[in-house]
Regions:
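Carbohydrate-active catalytic/glycan-binding domains of CAZyme proteins
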Residues: 1-483
Length: 483
């Protein structure tokens, strides 16, 4: 039987010069937000390297990117004067920042586009504002429309008005999550007709004590001191298996479907120990948890590499401190996560250049959101046959609870035809393939639930299979095999 795997995507080299934006491609993108508009994919991202006013990149395949300019080329003072004045008032002096951070771009009702942006007075402080701008064309020009949230001081009691992300619930209600670090992640309901706050409240109402903190800033969806870059995605009909696949054979009667909201955030320092975490809930604005860590979330990814060590020449990059991702569904139904990633890994905690990475998304049989541990190369989820896995040897990456070290790949896991999982000839557990592409296995006493999917295996420069799994300890386990 012939199986379909992605061909060579001809990724552009991970290199770039800060002073040559026309040649950047994926280089320099930070905190990306994706949209499909006017026949192409667009990524809006934080300002960097002098292109400070929201960078825009264009792609026709989610693989190759070209720089398309800035959302506010005239700058903050000229384009966003009301935002600048509002932040200066709460800061009590002139601001110390000339960069726009972490945008989100969505279609506007009735046509055009809504750009949700943020501006902060100084790095490391919460004197910030989230604003709305609009444009008729995806590449702009964008025009200021309103300020939705203004914060400043009492960080912890107040949130930080940055990192806005928009989503819609199953009934079409519009929400915005935002916040970072000590103030936690908050949520506000917006009016889908206008893109503005549904309650119409302003900072003046809060400053005059007409309303309290929760009314103005929104309720907490996550109380955290180290999370930022929230994104929520609503998914219908996620398959969930209610049986114990290790104890007995798959029973079709034990499958069901569920509707869930998935919250992703990134935690810790963006240049040293950044890592991507995930929660889920039955409700859009509350109840997000992730066993076994609850409000701490399950780890979707931390720093890892398909190199087998720092000197391995087979692949020239690592997935170093990946984070601040968007969750995006393409017009053809393919679900991906877009995030920034630094490379290569440095044990000296040196800042590294950041790039736009995209990875395929999947779900395990517990309904948990997973990421392919490979860059997207045009693949789609499909049914995986047993002969694609049985008797095959895989490289693997086991990510631990620590976040400062890079988890390098190791070789030697074999999924035997008799259901045994072997490591270098020693039995370490068992494995199961069930449903269309679900894989469960045990390794050294821990149970893992994952999904198998096609992938471009960059370390081997060939197409193949990847398995992304999460253990009952909430930690990821990845396997790659090229054909």
């Amino acid at each position: 039987m012939r199986f379909e795997y992605p061909g060579d995507p001809h990724f552009a080299p991970l290199a770039g010069r800060a002073d040559a934006p026309n040649n950047w491609g994926a280089f320099g993108a930070h905190d990306p937000s994706l949209i499909f508009a006017e026949g192409a994919y667009y990524a809006f991202s934080t300002g960097t390297f002098g292109e400070n006013y929201y960078q825009i990149r264009r792609s026709h395949d989610l693989i190759h990117w070209e720089y398309a300019g800035q959302a506010f080329p005239a700058g903050i003072a000229a384009s966003l004067a009301p935002v600048l004045r509002a932040v200066e008032r709460v800061y009590g002096k002139g601001t110390e920042n000339d960069t726009l951070w972490a945008p989100d771009i969505v279609p506007a009702q009735g046509g055009g586009y809504w750009l949700y942006g943020c501006y902060t007075a100084a790095f490391g402080k919460n004197y910030s504002a989230i604003f709305l701008a609009n444009a008729q064309n995806i590449e702009g020009p964008y025009i200021y429309a309103d300020t939705l949230v203004l914060t400043g001081g009492d960080w912890g009691l107040q949130p930080n008005a940055i990192d806005a992300q928009i989503f819609y619930d199953g009934e079409g209600r519009m929400f915005m999550t935002y916040g970072s670090f000590y103030g936690g992640i908050r949520i506000l309901e917006l009016d889908p007709r206008t893109g503005r706050r549904k309650d119409g409240l302003t900072y003046r109402d809060f400053a005059a004590r007409k309303v309290g903190r929760e009314a103005y800033f929104g309720r907490h969806v996550l109380r955290s001191s180290n999370a930022e870059g929230s994104v929520v995605a609503y998914k219908r009909g996620v398959p969930v298996y209610r049986g114990d696949i290790f104890a007995r054979a798959e029973d079709a009667r034990l499958w069901s479907q569920t509707d869930r909201y998935y919250l992703m955030c990134s935690a810790d320092s963006l240049s040293q120990d950044y890592n991507m975490r995930v929660w889920s809930s039955e409700f859009p604005d509350r109840g997000y948890t992730a066993p076994p860590y609850g409000f701490a979330g399950q780890k979707a990814a931390g720093s890892f590499s398909w190199r087998r060590g720092a000197e391995d020449p087979r692949i020239g990059f690592d997935f170093f401190v990946p984070g601040h991702n968007d969750l995006f569904t393409a017009p053809n139904g393919v679900e991906v996560a877009a995030y920034h990633c630094r490379t290569p890994y440095s044990d000296r905690r040196e800042p590294r250049a950041h790039y736009l990475f995209v990875s395929l998304c999947a779900y395990n049989s517990k309904g948990e959101l997973l990421l392919s541990p490979n860059r997207y190369a045009g693949e789609r989820l499909r049914k995986i046959e047993r002969e694609e896995l049985s008797g095959k040897t895989f490289d693997y990456v086991q990510i631990g609870s620590g976040n400062f070290d890079c988890a390098y790949a190791k070789s030697g896991i074999c999924l035997e035809g008799n259901g045994s999982l072997m490591l270098c000839g020693e039995k370490m557990g068992e494995w199961k393939l069930y449903g269309d592409n679900f894989v469960a296995f045990t390794f050294d006493g821990m149970r893992y639930f994952g999904a198998a999917m096609p992938a471009w295996i960059e370390a081997e420069a060939r197409g193949g299979i990847t398995i992304s799994a999460r253990g009952e300890d909430g930690l990821p386990f990845f396997l790659n095999r090229a054909f």
